[in-house]
Amino acid sequence: INWLKLGKKILGAI
């Protein structure tokens, strides 16, 4: 799991 990509997606959703 790419946490950087996942985190960026979450931040973008907020």
From Swiss-Prot:
Single Gene Ontology MF annotation: toxin activity
Function: Mast cell degranulating peptide with high potency of histamine release (EC(50)=0.09 uM on rat mast cells). Also shows high hemolytic activity (24% sheep erythrocytes lysis at 50 mM). Its mast cell degranulation activity may be related to the activation of G-protein coupled receptors in mast cells as well as interaction with other proteins located in cell endosomal membranes in the mast cells.
Tissue: Expressed by the venom gland.
UniProt keyword terms in alphabetical order: Amidation, Cytolysis, G-protein coupled receptor impairing toxin, Mast cell degranulation, Membrane, Secreted, Target cell membrane, Target membrane, Toxin
The protein, known as: Polistes mastoparan-R1
Primary localization class, coarse: secreted
A biological process from GO: killing of cells of another organism
GO cellular component terms given for this protein: extracellular region; membrane; other organism cell membrane
Modified residues (Isoleucine amide): I14
Cell location: Secreted; Target cell membrane
Family per record: Belongs to the MCD family. Mastoparan subfamily.
